[in-house]
Amino acid sequence: MLSKNKNITYLKECKICGNTNLKEVLQLNEQYISATFVKSNVDNNLTEIKTPLTLVLCSREDNSNNCGLLQLLEITEPDLLYRQYFYRSATNDTMRTDLKDVVENVTKIVKPQSGDIIIDTGSNDCTLLNFYDKQLSLVGYEPAKNIKYIDEGKNIKIFSDYFNSDQFKKNFKHKAKIITSCAMFY
């Protein structure tokens, strides 16, 4: 299915299980894209871009093995949303506390050892990665080009791009022990 908006593609199947039976749950019509904060609206195309928001459910009616994931039908060009991102995790005490809790909880479960690779996708300013022990191999993927990364002596390897498994395999010999992806689904 094609959109009138060249910045949008549409799901053809469930992102998790591949089911093509997607049932519309909620249609919010066209909305301005989020995270578009600019100095002036004059001659700025980003302030005019809208995208429809349609929630669809991976239907389990015809097959109980389907996953039932609730997801957006429309896929907005990621660069419009993330290349110039305004939010910084470190500026908010609540966010810093929550990210520290994520690290504490995941390390209680997984128990990484010195040298283990830890990846944070959408790592923002690396606040989360800085809560890990410096003996770990810390890797951040962040597509925003306007974010200054915080590296508190942890030697974090930053890729200014979206996560890419081929790029990861080219740069690292071992699988990651922990992969986090906070705030990627809202």
Could you tell me what each predicted segment is?
Residues 2-92:
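N-terminal juxtadomain amphipathic helix
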Residues 179-180:
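A conserved beta-strand element that flanks and buttresses the S-adenosyl-L-methionine
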Residues 150-152:
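Conserved SAM-binding loop
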Residues 125-135:
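Conserved SAM-binding loop of SAM-dependent methyltransferases across substrates and taxa
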Residues 113-124:
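Conserved class I S-adenosyl-L-methionine
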Residues 137-142:
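Conserved SAM-binding motif I beta-strand of class I
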Residues 96-115:
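Conserved alpha-helix/loop element of class I SAM-dependent methyltransferases that forms part
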Residues 154-168:
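Conserved SAM-binding strand-loop segment of SAM-dependent methyltransferases
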